[in-house]
Amino acid sequence: MTWIGCFIVGSSFSLVMPFLPLYIQSLGVTGANVELFSGLAFASTALVSGLVAPMWGKLADKYGRKPMMVRASFAMTFTMSAIAFSHQMGGYWWLLLMRSLMGFFSGFIPNSTAMIASQAPKERSGYALGILSTAMITGTLIGPSIGGLLAQWFGMANVFLIVGALLALATLLTVFFVHENFEPVAKSEMLSTKEIISRVGDKHILFGLLITSFIIQVTTQSIEPFVTLYIKTLTTNTNNLMFISGLIVSAVGLSAMMSSSTLGKLGDKYGAHRLILLGLVFSFAMYLPMAFVQTPLQLGLLRFMLGFGTGALMPSVNSLLAKITPKEGVSRIFAYNQMFSNFGVVVGPLLGSAIAGWVSYRMAFVVTSLFVVLNFFWSLINFRKYLRKRSIVE
């Protein structure tokens, strides 16, 4: 049921992505402000969520992850549904407020991840977390196509009500069917975040994993602001431009979904730290050629192959975090990981669009690949004394 809940939450966020700019336009926003205000609406959720994630993580360590999952999906039921009434309640600023509150009350997926990480046997944590990550990836992948159809059939405002109903379903499923083996920690025994970090054996690895989560999101999100324009330069046939762009953007999610559980199992067998290094090398080998492609097909194939690198990185990062973190602080560490990921979601599109606008589309891919190279060498330095070992946990 945790998988189903993560799937619903993941798809709920992506369902509204295809038509949100059009909905903002219907609220009276015109001209160049549509792109600006759409960017603010998207970024506000991720930014606020990242800022408050440590607070919710601390509460999860104190009261349990399941209550935080229920809290998140229950609150998002109302904030998402309320966007349907933006025309009556204050237009764009109401929408922006609800999107920000959605970010404030979010936390379903990181708490699900922390719960699985704390309960799964450590020798199988990569496999378990890999399976869980497919829920979010699958939901995010199919959400935009379903959202576009629902908007055509029922109208844009009603889609927010439908998504609210889905989130209510996720709340009920979590309340009645998700079980957590959580032992409350006495207030006197509650560790501070500083104490939790002090108990992590190698703090360089912890910080390196957080940076890796940040860079995964920066690199995967950086293409989205200009992918349609880049594809337009690669072909003279613009009849199906939006459809082709959607396929190319979603290709990385499809292959990541296909591979993450299998690669997570390989990480358990051969070492998640080794898999991270291989994933970064492979990702670099896919990113750099994207700067030199001549056709949309070439770009799409490279994006599809890139997903196998992403599928190796995400469960491996989560698995290592679970292994090096004391159980009293799992939720807080995963909350910080979510914070770094969300900041990557905000920075990625800004960085990609800035480089594409100031230099060129192709240079944006070169810079992205350099970020991956830097992350590889940093990780190599952090993991250097564990390369001959299957596990970094003594």
Where are these regions (language model features)?
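Hydrophobic core of transmembrane alpha-helices in multi-pass small-molecule transporters
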Residues: 7, 92-107, 298-312
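Short amphipathic helix-loop junctions that connect adjacent transmembrane helices
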Residues: 19-35, 226-243
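Central cavity-lining transmembrane alpha-helices of secondary-active solute carriers
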Residues: 40-56, 250-259
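Helix-to-loop junctions at the C-terminal end of transmembrane segments
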Residues: 51-64, 259-271
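C-terminal ends and interior cores of transmembrane alpha-helices
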Residues: 74-89, 282-294
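Helix-loop junctions on the cytosolic side of multi-pass membrane transporters
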Residues: 171-187, 381-392
